Amino acid sequence: MTGYTMLRNGGAGNGGQTCMLRWSNRIRLTWLSFTLFVILVFFPLIAHYYLTTLDEADEAGKRIFGPRVGNELCEVKHVLDLCRIRESVSEELLQLEAKRQELNSEIAKLNLKIEACKKSIENAKQDLLQLKNVISQTEHSYKELMAQNQPKLSLPIRLLPEKDDAGLPPPKATRGCRLHNCFDYSRCPLTSGFPVYVYDSDQFVFGSYLDPLVKQAFQATARANVYVTENADIACLYVILVGEMQEPVVLRPAELEKQLYSLPHWRTDGHNHVIINLSRKSDTQNLLYNVSTGRAMVAQSTFYTVQYRPGFDLVVSPLVHAMSEPNFMEIPPQVPVKRKYLFTFQGEKIESLRSSLQEARSFEEEMEGDPPADYDDRIIATLKAVQDSKLDQVLVEFTCKNQPKPSLPTEWALCGEREDRLELLKLSTFALIITPGDPRLVISSGCATRLFEALEVGAVPVVLGEQVQLPYQDMLQWNEAALVVPKPRVTEVHFLLRSLSDSDLLAMRRQGRFLWETYFSTADSIFNTVLAMIRTRIQIPAAPIREEAAAEIPHRSGKAAGTDPNMADNGDLDLGPVETEPPYASPRYLRNFTLTVTDFYRSWNCAPGPFHLFPHTPFDPVLPSEAKFLGSGTGFRPIGGGAGGSGKEFQAALGGNVPREQFTVVMLTYEREEVLMNSLERLNGLPYLNKVVVVWNSPKLPSEDLLWPDIGVPIMVVRTEKNSLNNRFLPWNEIETEAILSIDDDAHLRHDEIMFGFRVWREARDRIVGFPGRYHAWDIPHQSWLYNSNYSCELSMVLTGAAFFHKYYAYLYSYVMPQAIRDMVDEYINCEDIAMNFLVSHITRKPPIKVTSRWTFRCPGCPQALSHDDSHFHERHKCINFFVKVYGYMPLLYTQFRVDSVLFKTRLPHDKTKCFKFI
């Protein structure tokens, strides 16, 4: 009981204690809450009260701690002294501050003067360097002039022959006539200009028998020829047209011979005469057979061996297009390479070889004698076997569906009309031409007709019979355009044709197109070729190609050229010596006579042909490097005198592989005077600049009060006859340099960019070198070409709004390129730059060269260019596809690189400098 009672009491005591603790905690919480409430309520009220009375307290403080009314404190002596000291110090501080500002202003002015002096010193150093370079160049030029032992060549001065001939000893037989014994060279001095006198056929009896179409075509081309003269006394060559005759008129040989010998300038033997017998039909007879032509040359399409004199007479082409120019739109494209038929032949043999020979011989006897065997039967059997094998699709027909055309004996007669034959040849990769079996025939009119019809439509001629004498064979490399196969190899012809690669086949097709267009397509080309052939044989240079006479617009110059704020700093490097007056023109006509002696094969077998003498070409030979140090250094400016070097030595001389030269800026403009003036000012101080030719394309003259900038070189403002973009590429006579920088009036180019482009062009003179690149893209859905200006890793064009090219291409663009292209440029007022790229790539088979990273040009303040218009691009698409039709193929080629200077992004030692700072 006791333990239990105690337990109960103990438990009761602990419970009371717990209750007390709970009550105490509650009291504390209550006081804490009350305290917080009082603080939160009364503290903001108190703060609000004091804040509202703050202004009154400030006023009271001012009254307590501030200066007393009446300067009560200043009545004390030491306080007054302190006040005076404070005022004195304040005044001194103000004076010192004014002096400090004045000194700072003077220091700033002196710093500006120092900077100006430094700049003047740098400019003086640059001027001194320029003067040293000019002095060095002048001394070098003087030494070259004193040491020069070669006469300076220029346009030949005409030396004309005397009226009377000295006479030539006659050869034993006219059959042995060659130039050295039947041609009077004394009437044709090298500088005579090759004057040609053309007889008027109507004044002679045979003139009334001439085919009117042939006579009209011949007279028209003779009147327009640059060599033709009306003064027979000074003529080097005399030309007479005797055929083709009208049907059925046949002039007897004796009668024709009598009329020839009665020509007023025949001089007993006809030396320096050429008798032309043009044929329009395949059956044109050999009019001059059995006619004694004396020492006169004969030019016709049909020759017998007994009358043909190699190296003296001329095999000419038939007159296919008598009066009309060929239509480029009707000529099939050169691509695809392979056409429907591998080869075709249509013809019919009217008279066999055996029946034409006066004495019948066996096949074996013919093989042993001079005349070749009659392989016609073997040829027919072989070609039919190829056709029956069906390995390739070929078409051979040895009988005509209709009446065959008249032809010479042993010759394969033509089938059908010309239009029908051309349609078949358009489907043929190769065109077989079987030469006549008559060994007496050197060439026949029918065989020549087959040859030129094949060339016209791009069927590669395959001539069976190596004995044939093709037209102008002395000059033309026919192996580049045709296959000449001996008749005994007829069984191997199929294998030979299948073995040709696409690239070889296209090269032959393109060369054949060039030969046809240049020498055989029109009456003009035939007559010009006959004269060019004789002129080349006697080594007389061609007539100089004409230049466009520049009609200058008078203008006032004198405004000092300003500094372009957009011009990037060229650094410490000079860009080259600024040439002193007078400007240095490129040498002209240095190869007047060597071209006709050493380079006539290239001129005859490459565009544009041998008809013009150019002042200079981009294909002139280059001397080896050591020649400039061993006697042939005239005009060369090697880097460091030959020792080479980095930036400073590089900028002091042009170097390179050709002598020194300058360039001409040609700038086309149209009613943008302010933009033009700004562009001209940016050319101030440009090294190696010879002249600026501004092509004023506007019908309105420049403003009378317009003051042109003085940029240190002449500015020639040329007025044009009409507003045409083709004027950009006219070969103006004011352009006296080989290098032309064609630039738009709104193009911004730094001097270092121009100089780098010029140096690159000097190493690639036959190509366009410039800045903005474009390319041609294949439109897969429409199977055509597109003009594309997007950024690309391939390009095929460099726009001529900022590009260097050779003046040679200006001649070709204006006088040689098909007129249809220039007409389209005028129609769209667009595409002239594309046309120039087509031309250069067609001539060289090379792409252009892009320099620097520029892709477009910005022109702040210029009106919006036409190139931003959608129609501009649509027109350029059309231009590209039209140009392809005219050329017959796409001449543009792709390139995947651009050119930068040699030391660009190269780490150099401290004593070396870069070629260009930014390029």
UniProtKB/Swiss-Prot annotation:
Residues 1-140 are annotated as: Required for interaction with REG3A. Changing R339W: In ISDNA; changed glycosaminoglycan synthesis. Signal peptide: none annotated. This is Exostosin-like 3. It is a single-pass type II membrane protein. Glycans are attached at N290, N592, N790. The gene is EXTL3. The modification Phosphoserine is found at S362.
